[in-house]
Amino acid sequence: MEEIEDKEPRQENEELKIPDVLPLLPVRDVVVYPYMILPLFVGREISINAVDQALSRDRLIFLATQKEMGDEEPTPEGMYTVGTVAMIMRMLKLPDGRVKVLVQGLAKGLITEFVESKPAYTVRIERIVEPSVPEESLETEALMRAVKEQLTQIVSLGKAVSPEVLVIVENMQEPGSLADLIASNIGLKVDDAQALLEIIDPVQRLQKVNEHLNKEHELLDMQVKIQSAAKEEMGKSQREYFLREQLRAIQQELGETDPRSEELNELRKAIEQAKMPPVVEKEAFKQLGRLEQMHPDAAEAGMLRTFLDWMVELPWGKATKDVLDIKRARQILDEDHFYLEKIKERILEFLAVRKLRKKMKGPILCFVGPPGVGKTSLGKSIARAMGRKFVRISLGGVRDEAEIRGHRRTYVGALPGRIIQGLKQAGSNNPVFMLDELDKLGADFRGDPSSALLEVLDPEQNHMFSDHYINLPFNLSNVMFIATANQIDTVPGPLRDRMEVIQLSGYTEEEKLEIAKRYLIPRQMKENGISEKEIVISDEAVRTIIAKYTREAGLRNLEREIGSVCRKVARKVAEGDGRRFRITPATVAKYLGPARFIREGEMEKNEVGIVTGLAWTPVGGEVLFVEATIMKGKGGLTLTGHLGDVMKESVQAALSYIRSKAKEFHLAEDFLSGYDIHVHVPAGAIPKDGPSAGVTMATALVSALTRVPVRKDVAMTGEITLRGKVLPIGGLKEKMLAAIRAGIKTIVIPEQNEKDLEEIPKHILKKVTVVSAKVIDDVLAVALETFPPPPPASEGKPAATVKAPPRRGIAAPRKGAMAGAKS
């Protein structure tokens, strides 16, 4: 490093000869006053050249402040014109190429002309001479005293000013020099400091400095008040802490306890009595220890207290004792629900195994069936029969995974998931836990709740279920989980695989009648404040309500209509009518209005091209009519009725089969030439799809092509292949119930579905004739009036263009009844 020797500082009264032209050094973020000594770091090439020029002459250099601090290449317009002539007292070249100079301000100057710009700025200056101040001026003397006193006061308030400066200030007698010295030491903004430098009159400049000192005094006063308030608050908190500690010590000496200590001791006892697993108990005591060390008002203290409350309230070791009396359990199940034998048998099997083997995992069941068949209420009965607590949570519309697993404790307002909340609500670790509407779970950017349920419903994993909030394992293996769904198709495969699925079919008319007599009518009479003295509802009236006012697989609408009848009777009783009201089929319309549904399928006669099919929907079975007609055309096939792709393909397959067997049906191979076929399924606003309408489509086409009428009392279901084989279908019981509601006498089913008849109650089978079909000819033999069909008058062509006559007494399906119908 190269160093230039020191130059002695000039005294204030020392004569100075300043040349007119000097090298210019632009400075940033500082204003240099006369007689001010400060170091400057010089790094720009143009500035280093200016320093070199000054050192090569008389060490004098002109310092002007830049208007913009970030300007790396300042122009003449970017610098203030009023600056300070300075002497370079010392120069040191640094290893990084920069130069450090120590300068002393000498006199103010005004730039009148920029002479050169390279290799360094050179300027012509005019020295600024300040006017003299009379020594006898009392006003000036008073101002100087006021300024000195103000400076002393702000230093006492904490303003950083060196003691040497204070000594110099006290001995100064010149107002201009006093103003410059104070301005250079109180940390003014660059704009304010430059404005002071440009004031030539010393007294005016000192007055401006006094204004800045007053402003600084006010700011420091406010700062002191803020700091005092903060210290006072901190001191108050510390004082409270010491007093609280002293109070605790005094209470301990007296054998007393403060409320917080008593609360923490109760929490400690609760943890000891909660029968937690060792790992959980260790964590609980650890968090309790943290809570004891915290100030009660600390933000984390509230969160820890809530966490520990959850820990002690969870039923870690609390369980209800199972009632293993199988006969009593059977009695309770029969009291609450009529029929549903399959589910009752499964519950009794569980109790029997539990009786023989004490330790076993809780079953995970899934009840699938239409709305209103008793899935949810069955869970309550199971809990009552087993002597367990019952918890139900609805999963319909749940889209956030945190609803199942909970939120992590770091979030404000975090809580455990609904599984842990349900167990706390139950107060035991082995309740009957119902997950209602499992098929209506959603998923979005917050996660997939169905995936979170995988751990809950897996017997191999749920003994170590970890909720995000608790973050400790909880044993769910003793819980008996029961899920409910309207359709199993929408439940994800991995979740479905973990459950034992039990199908609940819709109720028959006889079952509905029995349930209404045993449960619905007594319940509605009680809810509406009437008794058997005021109302009697006959069995036939109930049958009328079932047939003409409700069309459902379950019982909700039936109970609603019975409730409507009871309310109308209750009103009359309340008005003073003392009669005993007897509800008969003839008087039902008086209370419920005109019949909403007319039995389907009641046609006057057998018709050509109209076939009764059977469909399955999530709300039960439905009757599905298929119509086919032939007309002159170009051999086209038209399909209407909002049919799905599978159903359209069934029509194509049926037509291909008929064409392959045209000779047997007395049809020419080109029987489609010159004719169009139109297949329609009524209720066109409702989407329909599924493979099991194949035999229905084939029968309608054969009837339309051969002009052989279809029997009106025959319904059918089954899938067809190109070889004419009839394949099995699902939902047989629901379809048979729909056929019975429609007055059908004969039902044609696939031969491979004969095994399913064992699960259908005998009283249902007695109402219809069931015919099994292996091939489509078996179906046609039952459905058509004559089979094989006779040869038509015009051999080889369709028998005639048949337009199906209108059916009488057929009500349009209610809105939504066939939504998503699967044939």
Swiss-Prot record:
<feature type="domain" description="Lon proteolytic">
    <location>
        <begin position="605"/>
        <end position="786"/>
    </location>
</feature>
<dbReference type="GO" id="GO:0005737">
    <property type="term" value="C:cytoplasm"/>
</dbReference>
<dbReference type="InterPro" id="IPR015947">
    <property type="entry name" value="PUA-like_sf"/>
</dbReference>
<dbReference type="GO" id="GO:0004176">
    <property type="term" value="F:ATP-dependent peptidase activity"/>
</dbReference>
<dbReference type="InterPro" id="IPR003111">
    <property type="entry name" value="Lon_prtase_N"/>
</dbReference>
<comment type="subunit">
    <text>Homohexamer. Organized in a ring with a central cavity.</text>
</comment>
<dbReference type="Pfam" id="PF00004">
    <property type="entry name" value="AAA"/>
</dbReference>
<keyword id="KW-0547">Nucleotide-binding</keyword>
<keyword id="KW-0645">Protease</keyword>
<dbReference type="GO" id="GO:0005524">
    <property type="term" value="F:ATP binding"/>
</dbReference>
<keyword id="KW-0963">Cytoplasm</keyword>
<keyword id="KW-0720">Serine protease</keyword>
<dbReference type="GO" id="GO:0016887">
    <property type="term" value="F:ATP hydrolysis activity"/>
</dbReference>
<feature type="region of interest" description="Disordered">
    <location>
        <begin position="788"/>
        <end position="823"/>
    </location>
</feature>
<dbReference type="InterPro" id="IPR046336">
    <property type="entry name" value="Lon_prtase_N_sf"/>
</dbReference>
<dbReference type="Pfam" id="PF02190">
    <property type="entry name" value="LON_substr_bdg"/>
</dbReference>
<dbReference type="InterPro" id="IPR003959">
    <property type="entry name" value="ATPase_AAA_core"/>
</dbReference>
<protein>
    <recommendedName>
        <fullName>Lon protease</fullName>
        <ecNumber>3.4.21.53</ecNumber>
    </recommendedName>
</protein>
<comment type="function">
    <text>ATP-dependent serine protease that mediates the selective degradation of mutant and abnormal proteins as well as certain short-lived regulatory proteins. Required for cellular homeostasis and for survival from DNA damage and developmental changes induced by stress. Degrades polypeptides processively to yield small peptide fragments that are 5 to 10 amino acids long. Binds to DNA in a double-stranded, site-specific manner.</text>
</comment>
<dbReference type="GO" id="GO:0043565">
    <property type="term" value="F:sequence-specific DNA binding"/>
</dbReference>
<dbReference type="InterPro" id="IPR027543">
    <property type="entry name" value="Lon_bac"/>
</dbReference>
<dbReference type="InterPro" id="IPR027065">
    <property type="entry name" value="Lon_Prtase"/>
</dbReference>
<feature type="active site">
    <location>
        <position position="735"/>
    </location>
</feature>
<dbReference type="InterPro" id="IPR014721">
    <property type="entry name" value="Ribsml_uS5_D2-typ_fold_subgr"/>
</dbReference>
<dbReference type="Pfam" id="PF05362">
    <property type="entry name" value="Lon_C"/>
</dbReference>
<feature type="domain" description="Lon N-terminal">
    <location>
        <begin position="22"/>
        <end position="217"/>
    </location>
</feature>
<dbReference type="GO" id="GO:0004252">
    <property type="term" value="F:serine-type endopeptidase activity"/>
</dbReference>
<dbReference type="Pfam" id="PF22667">
    <property type="entry name" value="Lon_lid"/>
</dbReference>
<dbReference type="GO" id="GO:0006515">
    <property type="term" value="P:protein quality control for misfolded or incompletely synthesized proteins"/>
</dbReference>
<keyword id="KW-0378">Hydrolase</keyword>
<dbReference type="InterPro" id="IPR020568">
    <property type="entry name" value="Ribosomal_Su5_D2-typ_SF"/>
</dbReference>
<dbReference type="InterPro" id="IPR004815">
    <property type="entry name" value="Lon_bac/euk-typ"/>
</dbReference>
<feature type="binding site">
    <location>
        <begin position="369"/>
        <end position="376"/>
    </location>
    <ligand>
        <name>ATP</name>
    </ligand>
</feature>
<dbReference type="InterPro" id="IPR054594">
    <property type="entry name" value="Lon_lid"/>
</dbReference>
<dbReference type="InterPro" id="IPR008268">
    <property type="entry name" value="Peptidase_S16_AS"/>
</dbReference>
<dbReference type="InterPro" id="IPR003593">
    <property type="entry name" value="AAA+_ATPase"/>
</dbReference>
<dbReference type="InterPro" id="IPR008269">
    <property type="entry name" value="Lon_proteolytic"/>
</dbReference>
<feature type="active site">
    <location>
        <position position="692"/>
    </location>
</feature>
<comment type="similarity">
    <text>Belongs to the peptidase S16 family.</text>
</comment>
<keyword id="KW-0346">Stress response</keyword>
<dbReference type="GO" id="GO:0034605">
    <property type="term" value="P:cellular response to heat"/>
</dbReference>
<dbReference type="InterPro" id="IPR027417">
    <property type="entry name" value="P-loop_NTPase"/>
</dbReference>
